[in-house]
Amino acid sequence: MFLALVRRDLLLIARSPALWLPVMFFVLVAAIFPFAVGPDARLLARIAPGIIWVAALLASLLPVETLLAPDVEDGTIDQLISRGIALELVCAARICAHWLGFAVPLLAALPVAGVLLGLDGDAGTRLGIALLLGTPALASLAVVAAALTAGLKGGGALAGLIVLPLALPVLIFGVGSDVDGAFRLLGAASLVALAIGPFAAAAALKPE
């Protein structure tokens, strides 16, 4: 059932006209920052991890209004509940699909962003590993925020306010991925977020 739910969610993402929006945003941020920072290649390479992590966080939030709100509004969530499917399973599948839909394209686009920001090969590899370990936490936080704001007007803005402070530890560990233990901390943060996220999102979606 879990795989069927993930497949359904991925098909919905693939049919969305905004499919490429997160990765386009990610690359555009990487392309624009060199103009803002100036010609100092060393400075640009030094701040590149922070730029890429902030871009990844914001990219994870771009589709937040479409993660759960449409299913709440059209009754899909109620139908799944009536069929005896646990909301926790639905939310876990949505987290997985959201990660596959935004993080995998971002990882594929990372070499382009790295070239634009002047990252060398070793730094780019470390950053790629850090994103692989840390983006599941961002996906989980985005789905929890989507559940909390489903059905609210302006839910996307509110979801951003919810996620940004909670994502700070992930950004701190991600930017410091050249420090010993940062990868382990990123992995631990993602495991905690993935363990708690489906239950928190399901609790927010359950009818009163």
Language-model segments: residues:
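Transmembrane helix boundary and interhelical loop/hinge segments in multi-pass membrane proteins
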Residues: L61-I81, E208
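A structural motif at transmembrane helix-loop-helix junctions in multipass membrane proteins
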Residues: L132-L164, L205-E208
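Membrane-interfacial helix-loop-helix connectors in multipass membrane proteins
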Residues: V37-I47, P111-L132, G176-L185
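Long, hydrophobic alpha-helical segments
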Residues: A48-L68
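Membrane-interface alpha-helices at helix entry/exit sites of multi-pass transporters
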Residues: I85-W99, R126, G160
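Hydrophobic alpha-helical transmembrane segments that constitute the membrane-spanning cores
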Residues: A92-G118, A137, L141, G174
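Aromatic- and glycine-rich beta-strand/loop motifs that create alpha-glucan
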Residues: M1-P22
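Junction motif at the cytosolic side of a transmembrane helix
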Residues: L191-E208
